[in-house]
Structures are given as C-alpha cells and as structure tokens.
Amino acid sequence: VGNPYARGEDSSVQSNMTVTLKDFYADWCGPCKTQDPIIEELEADWEGVEFEKVDVDEHQDVANEYQVRSIPTIVVENDDGVVERFVGVTQRDELEDALQEAGA
C-alpha cells in the first residue's frame, strides 16, 4: 500500500512538462557576461530544459512581453506559465531550485 502521489510516481508526470529558461541579456552588459558561464554550465547539465538567450536590443518585443526592465533577467517557465523570475546575476543553486520547481 503505497502513496500514489509519491515522488517517484510524480516525477514521470513532471518530466512531460516543457521547462524553459529564458536569459535576457545585452552584449554591452557587464553583469550579463558574469551570468553567461553559469547558464552554460546549467545547459550542459540539464538536458530536458530548453535554454533561450534573448538579446533585449534585438528583441525588444519579447523583453516587453516579459516585462524585462533590467538585465540580466532570467525567467523560468513551464507549460503553465512563469514559475520564477530573477533580476541580476543569479547563482546556479537558485536557478536549479527554480528548474526543479518548474518540473524539470
């Protein structure tokens, strides 16, 4: 008699969810350059997550849609919408927590 909602059962449902990390940046942004290696490490380790870099100078429409006012801004979302938003340089552990919360 097990719990049907036990973590092992639940993870298969979560793995079907699309999880995306959007990294809003600009080439001239110093803190964005600090953020880059952290994002690159995550991308190498989190195969099931879609990573998108969004240059705010080239894609102002997308930046406006996500209400990006400062960079770097990182948005973690899944099929249900935005799960977490980070403004400024964000450490790997915080981003990993958000990816897990999103269902990755």
Question: Which stretches of residues belong to each language-model region?
Answer:
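N-terminal amphipathic/basic-hydrophobic helices that include classical n-h-c signal peptides
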Residues: V1-N16
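Short active-site neighborhood of thiol/selenol oxidoreductases, capturing the structured segment around
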Residues: M17-Y25
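Thiol-based oxidoreductase modules, predominantly thioredoxin-like and allied folds used
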Residues: F24, E43-Q60
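The canonical Cys-X-X-Cys-His
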Residues: C29-C32, I74
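Typically the conserved alpha-helix immediately C-terminal to a functionally engaged Cys/Sec
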Residues: K33-W46
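Structural micro-motif
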Residues: Y66-V75
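Non-catalytic, surface beta->alpha helical segment in thiol-disulfide oxidoreductase systems
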Residues: V76-A104
